Amino acid sequence: MTTSEKRRRLIEAAVDLFTEHGIHATSLADIAKRADVPLGNVYYYFKTKDDLARAVFAHRAWEIDQLTENLDRYASPAERLREFLLFVAHHADGYTRNGCPIGRLCQEMNMATPLSDEVARLFGAVLTWLEGQFRQLGAADSRRQAVHLLGAVQGAILLAKTFRDESLLKAEMERLAQAV
């Protein structure tokens, strides 16, 4: 296995485990085991758990970029917003099981630290993209609309996870998509 392959596997394992259990409940040993990499190799690539967390944040930022690039291929902002909501509905199983991976990171990084600022930028990227869609629709209060929609999505994810019922999330995303 190449060094870049080991690093990639460690990041992917951390992404999965942070989503499933959270940052604080996941040890570096857990990550090494999931990645099938010796524990000592973790320290070769990441000097601290914070360094690994930053790599996870960068991976999540890349995922957000990929999502918004794909959504931007739709012709109108209304279509893009609907497709965003249908994307969430399509992934209802994972959100119901683990919650929103970005939301979970933000909740864990709730203290004023450099890491909390870094993870907040992930939601900031989503919020900025949503705001741009509402602005293109001509909404005078595009920021407020974006905050409202993101809050509705996060609330629906939380309820689906709480009640272990993905149909709640799917139904709410479909309702919101029809309202756009």
Residues covered by each model-derived region:
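N-terminal positioning helix adjacent to the helix-turn-helix/winged-helix DNA-binding module
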Residues: 5-6, 13, 145
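Short helix-capping/turn signature of helix-turn-helix
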Residues: 46, 104-111
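Helix-turn-helix
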Residues: 9, 13-51, 55
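Amphipathic alpha-helical packing segments from all-alpha helical-bundle domains
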Residues: 62-65, 69, 94, 112-136, ...
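Hydrophobic alpha-helical connector segments
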Residues: 55, 69-98, 149
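A secondary-structure capping/hinge motif
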Residues: 50-52, 105, 114
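Hydrophobic alpha-helical segments that form the core
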Residues: 104-107, 141-162, 175-178
